[in-house]
């Protein structure tokens, strides 16, 4: 299974070619795709991929592996949100995926042991490793006109106690102190929850002072100096806020929740507390512009 991002297309293609050279009968599934049309396009443009999956993949991927292992590939159309090949033709699911994994389930906790065993085997220094965590999925706002990040994803939050336990356990188990969050908005329109989450991160950092949060994304609306200071104390070094434009008029037109003033104040407080603001993109040439 290959998680497909824009920056990984070439790497995924090369990996797929090598796998097919070694084992032509191997089934390669590509995921992390936003729409049905994009999934079809991947199969049209990359011959080494056999199946493309769009939207959330945990449950469909489980059903897919069951069908393949039981040699029931003629039943693939019953699995939601996949495109696949049959006799040179690209077909798609008859049904949408309606099954979404419980983010707080321990069954979803990743095990990176084999990855770090390989790092040790090849002598790769652990300082280059970065652990990824998820405290929620999709976005509570879902209104920004240009955003494609949440297509096929259902918004829901993870129990913060589960996330904090996962972080503490992973840091202890793997000895990795650089982490990042994959959430589109760590605050999730719930400042009390975010405050409690920061408290938990600070407790972990007391035990592991080297803990560094190298990426986290938030919506700047409603964030004040106290919150930014607490983020710094919790270990945040880099944050993304979805800046997009210095024009309030344009931000309103594209339905951003951020405002020029909320972005400016966050950048001011972040500078004060030594948090780097990453990915402060300025969008140009929008239809609304």
PLM feature spans:
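Structural beta-sheet core signal
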Residues: 30, 215, 279-281
């Amino acid at each position: 299974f290959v998680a497909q991002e824009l920056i990984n297309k070439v790497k995924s293609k090369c990996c797929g070619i090598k796998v097919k050279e070694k084992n032509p009968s191997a089934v390669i599934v590509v995921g992390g795709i936003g729409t049905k049309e994009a999934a079809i396009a991947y199969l049209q443009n990359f011959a080494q991929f056999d199946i493309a999956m769009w939207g959330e993949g945990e449950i469909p991927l489980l059903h897919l592996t069951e069908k393949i292992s039981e040699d029931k590939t003629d039943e693939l159309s019953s699995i939601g949100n996949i495109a696949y090949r049959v006799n040179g033709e690209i077909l798609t699911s008859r049904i949408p995926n309606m099954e979404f994994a419980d983010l707080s389930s321990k069954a979803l906790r990743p095990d990176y042991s084999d990855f770090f065993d390989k790092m040790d085997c090849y002598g790769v220094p652990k300082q280059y490793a970065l652990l990824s965590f998820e405290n929620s999925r999709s976005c509570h706002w879902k209104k920004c006109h240009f955003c494609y990040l949440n297509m096929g994803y259902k918004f829901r939050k993870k129990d913060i106690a589960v996330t904090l336990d996962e972080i503490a356990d992973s840091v202890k188990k793997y000895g990795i102190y650089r982490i990042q969050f994959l959430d589109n908005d760590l605050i999730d329109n719930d400042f009390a929850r975010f405050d409690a989450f920061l408290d938990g991160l600070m407790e972990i950092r007391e035990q592991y002072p080297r803990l560094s949060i190298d990426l986290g994304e938030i919506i700047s609306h409603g964030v004040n100096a106290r919150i930014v200071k607490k983020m710094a104390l919790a270990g945040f070094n880099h944050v993304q806020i979805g800046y997009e434009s210095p024009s309030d008029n344009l931000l309103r037109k594209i339905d951003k929740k951020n405002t020029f003033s909320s972005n400016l104040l966050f950048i001011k407080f972040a500078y004060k507390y030594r948090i780097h603001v990453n990915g402060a993109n300025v969008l140009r040439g929008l239809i609304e512009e």
